[in-house]
């Protein structure tokens, strides 16, 4: 068994997994924050992770993205993603405060529900074609849809993904109190899924995102319109 060290600021022990889903590697790892432990690294994510005082910075190299264009001409499966396994038979909520460094169009910080490279959901704070920063959601089932949502003028945003086993909701907040619904999906994903965080720089030369207050709980929100309650 080959063993590699794969973190910039901590010793994250990584061993290759048998199934390689991503173009640049799919490995087990152990990166621990106060309320979540990431156990899987896609596309070298653990090698580009820095943890300090409970905060995590994840860097993306140039031209990294996860997107499968509906026209079938583009498929980029190279974004660094840190994941943790989740029992989808039970409720869950993943929340994080995200502060991207925007340098180029489509730079973003994201949250994921991940099954495989052509079956996933992501929610992002992204820089659009006009240079505005906005919420974006993408659902990939073979190919990717792409949805632009509200413009965000603050430098940071709280993002939340929650499921009661039947419905998945995407939400954002500027104050961690009042939540805005972005999108609802039917939860028709497998019994075991992966959830996590990512950074992307599809057109740029790389960027980084600061993730704070990353929390995974085994409860869902109670109001899927307001995004509140346990």
Per-range role (PLM):
Residues 1-23:
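Bacterial Sec-dependent N-terminal signal peptides
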Residues 22-230:
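Extracellular glycan-recognition regions
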